[in-house]
């Protein structure tokens, strides 16, 4: 398909740059580059690949940045900004909980939740480096969990998603950036292994559950009093009823 010259090419900046270097694709006819979730690309240190890609396209081109969670300070890299506003609302069928837990007990809490609640959950991490360790510890404790790290190739990612949809996996571990392309209509639960860095990210994560009129759950792990204050601020702004959920961990 690449040899035929596709009209639209979709991929991560790193992968596209790799194909350019391998001379698998030619960029001389490209007139538009779209960066979806560009704020996440910036925070994930992938933007240097974008700079490299731009050197291979014609000087006359259009660069479009798209994001649902970008901060205004990032507008300085964009000439023209268009904001599309939507109603700020939370579905009534999503229930929000928090659990106060020590950092070292987070994995054990995941294990207990998976065993007691019998649900499938998408677990969000702030740091990509934490995925592998959590996956290894959960699997050692006989929990069907896999991580969607950035180094997992597309073939295995599709396999993991199908297994998750078919109830063959219990926990799917991911960062916000890696989870962008995941679409699961019947997801029962979202777990914030780490407190989201801002309200927009919390809302985006919560929106993964409670779809198609089904009841959904959002559980956030809290390790410090300041985190609880921040979470309660999120709840106040979004008019969320936030409840404490206790779980005994040996």
Predicted regions mapped to residue ranges:
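Conserved helicase RecA-like core
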Residues: 1-250
